[in-house]
Amino acid sequence: MFEKIPNQNSHSMGDNNTGYYNNNNNNNNNNNNNNNNSNNNNNNSNNNNNNNINNNNNNNNNNNNNNNNNNNNNNNTSQQLPSPQLSQPNSMNTTPNQTSPNLRSSPNRVANNMTQINILTPHLLPGSPSASPIPISSIPTASVYRQPFSSSSSSNHDQGSYPIINTKSIIPSASQLQSQNLNIINSINNNFSKDSPNSQNNTSFNEDTIFIASTTYGSSNTPNNNNNNINNNNSNNNNNSNNSNNNNNSTNNNNNSSNINSPNDFNNNHNNNNNNNNNNNNNNNNNNSSNSNINNNNNNSNNSNNNIDNSNNNNNNNNVRSGNSNVNANGHNRLKRKSKENIYNNNNQNNNNQNNNQNNNHNNNHNNNHNNNQNNNQNNIQNTNQNNIQNNHNQQNNNNHQNNNNQNNNYQNNNNQNSGNNNNQNHHNNKFNQNNNHNQNNHSNNQNKNNHNNNHNNNNHNNNNHNNNNNNHNNNNNNHNNNNNHNNQNNHNNQNNNHNNNQNNNYNNNQNNNYNPNNYGNNYNPNNNYNNSNNPNNMNNNYNHNQNNNNNNNNNNQNYNNNHNNQFNNQNNQIHNQSNNQNNYNQNNNHNNNNQNNNNNNQNNNNNNNQNNNNNNNNINNNNNNNNNNNNGNTGLSSSTNNSKHSSPRSSPNNSPLNYNTNEEYYNSGSSSPSSPGSPNSSILQITDGNNGFNNQNNLNNGNNGNQNYNNNNGQFNNNFDNNGQNNNNNNNNNNNNNNNNNENNRNSPTTTQPQIQTTQPLINGANSAFVFPSTPKTNSSTTLFGVMPNEQETWIEIRDLSCSISKMAKSSLTNGITEEMLNEIKEKGTDLINMIENVTQKEKLERKYNDDDRNRIFPPLTRPRRFRKKKKPNVTEPPVEKVKKKADTLFCTSCGTTQTPEWRKGPAGGKSLCNACGLHYAKLMKKEIQLSKVETTSSPPSTSMNVVNLLN
């Protein structure tokens, strides 16, 4: 049934993209009481959408919600029913396999209620001002899903019937529809009602009819607005700025007015859309001139950038132009033949080509603007990089929603449902075209392939030299990476690749152009989560890295010259320098061959993931060193697989002659054999790293200066040595001098022998070690060591506990400060400790007087006192002074020295002089002594009865 349409002053029936299909967008955007105002608001809303989308280029996090709100409103309607309107080719669901269920599966639905509505349609000549009313009862209707007018974007749908306009009535022009806009709307408002009885007409889809999603062609402003939505959304898909959107508005208004005139203009709309895509690309170039350095710095690179990003697009646009020219002829003939099927197929073909073209335009132009906005916002490059890169998927989703503004489900399906095929197809197309266009970039930017290779050596080494030498080429590399990012969405390694390369490039641009305006401290590197918190000197280090790379690896050569005095270190740095150059070239080949070879893509992904895991855009030189085995495989550099808790896993094999791992217990040397130089048996590496690490404070400091490749202060000086060998202009002299000083003796030759190693190796039990453990005590003739008596073990345990508690209090006082109570407590514990030590020494002096026979007479106590007993909780009312006992009054056992016993016993020293166990043992001995004395008194005179007392004492 027809539902009563609300006031058309707020919803234009002439808006081909509004009404039942785009009513959420209209409810969100149009709230005025005049049709012209509503159309103007449509234009304003489209311009606002363009502004939001252009703001998405700058602040994706801030305006993604706006785009998602506006686009989700259109998304519900676009997924409900594509509107195959002639004035909106981009708003059609043009996938041939995804036709509307209402159009295909249920062609014979019957409209329950029909009203007699006079719809004004002009006659054959497009310039004739006359128009005759056609009753709507003569127009067949079809029941389709529609969404009622509501301000919410709910997906509840009811069924209603819509008129189907015969193609015999020629589509009016925009100038003719202006005067008839209000008449149409008023007639529709007066005739459409819920309660009006209507006749039932059987509807069927003949080849003489075309289904029009909205009722009639209304005012000239609203189709222009719809096409402005299309073209603006095309510009939004291309992420153009406001200038490009305005250009598209101006060009598309002309095209839209011609679109209404004739079916040829409909097909010209495709051509115009393609031209608008080209204009969008040109406007993107203008925007690139404002957002980046492409047009400003290098016009040739700008043209080559268009060739890079839009070579597929231009080829596709040419193909689409030729296809559209065929469509112009064929489509016009099909309209004369009045074939709906052919028209849909024609539209599907056009829109498939258009959507493929838009996919290419979207990917490439969006990458252009994405990177160029990064280059534009170099003052806030971390924020924009984080927003843009963290929201790569969000931007793609926003682009899908922007395409939903176009109601182009085919384009969305090309991005989502056909991601396996379409994205791979784009990937293969980008394989061919990006490589060719990248070579065009090389010739256009550098005009020299050798120069291009040099720029690659600078670019991928730290991407800074590439930015300074040719910012346009840097943007082209970003476009390649972002093409991988958008086209290869199912490869997260490529996306990490783009994280690294984009942030490296823009971050290095930021350093080169602005010298760290807001990148000091923790905000220095957006991905360097490990080095930021510990490295306040990251700024100097990475700035010097950029200077090194801007000097075409002169710093690495300087390292080679500084370490030239040491032969072994010379070979090491030579390997590093060679590996850096090879990695630079290989990474540029990975830029050239990211889309040519999947194996190279995997290697590039491994390298870039290692860049994320190892250095996170701080030490690209050193990451190239660590990742050299992934690219070259046999350069002899070790990435030293870390097994520490804080280090990130690296999968490169350890075939290095140098392994700077000091603690092989925590840092395994990978897959090296015991005989290989990287094995734990090769203590050359351990010794020199111990010297470089512990004796060389510059190495430790420089390791903290932004060059901790996950060292984590655990003694792994692999990357510290690499960094110190190739680090900074400020630190090269110190590090290289220290390396030379420390390594002239240790690394004088690569074939040092084992006795030379042992001379400098820190012994475990030696004097140079941090912990000295005596193996066997030095025995003198005058002194002999006695074992600890069982009765004295408790005393030694308590001495240990007291000393530990004193040390803990001292440590806490260093960090948290000390109070008078803590000082008094430490003093009291110290006096207790001294008293206990004195008692033990007295007992040891007594025990040394006894021989073995006398010692055997003293048995250990049968029961052992518990060390820790539960004590009663002190009363809260007691003053704190009574809690602390005077240490002079503390009792201790004169036999074993313990201070904790359940009961004190009488001993030879008086009452409460023995603990419970010793007192009981003493009592048994006294009983035995008394019994023996009684026996002896009967036979012999009494002897001394103080044997037990002497033994106990």
UniProtKB/Swiss-Prot annotation:
GO MF, any single term: zinc ion binding
Zn finger residue spans: GATA-type: 893-918
Entry superkingdom: Eukaryota
S-S bridge residues: none
Organism this protein belongs to: Dictyostelium discoideum
Residue ranges of the region described as Disordered: 1-109, 216-756, 934-953
Record gene name: gtaN
Stated name of the protein: GATA zinc finger domain-containing protein 14
Keywords tagged on the record: Metal-binding, Zinc, Zinc-finger
Biased composition (Low complexity): 22-89, 219-330, 342-683, 690-756
Compositionally skewed regions (Polar residues) per UniProt: 1-21, 90-109
SUPFAM superfamilies linked: Glucocorticoid receptor-like (DNA-binding domain)
Biological process annotations from GO: regulation of DNA-templated transcription
